[in-house]
């Protein structure tokens, strides 16, 4: 399943040419005992948090830099990086979720460069 949220450069015209929803400001996914709050990151981010409970996950890609850090009360901040415009010498990358395992992968080779079990 593909999950998309609106980015800071996305507009209604983008939705008109796609067959799946891309304009939500956020999505919430239950994974095990955690909730993943997925958003682009230009509205909600680590300095302006959405309503997270202890242990919940903030997932956003606005910075275009892969990241995985713990903060708050067992919360996690995850960033898949960017497939198109990576920053800070990071690889072109994306993230997958299978069961309760997140994997960061390089776009060209699909090689896993980080893995995290929630």
Task: Give the role of each language-model region.
Residues 9-15, 43-48, 59-71, 84-89:
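Active-site environment of divalent metal-dependent phosphoester hydrolases
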Residues 22, 39-45, 114-116:
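Short N-terminal helix-initiation segments at or just after the protein's N-terminus
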Residues 25-32, 71-72, 77-118:
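Binuclear metal-dependent phosphoesterase catalytic core
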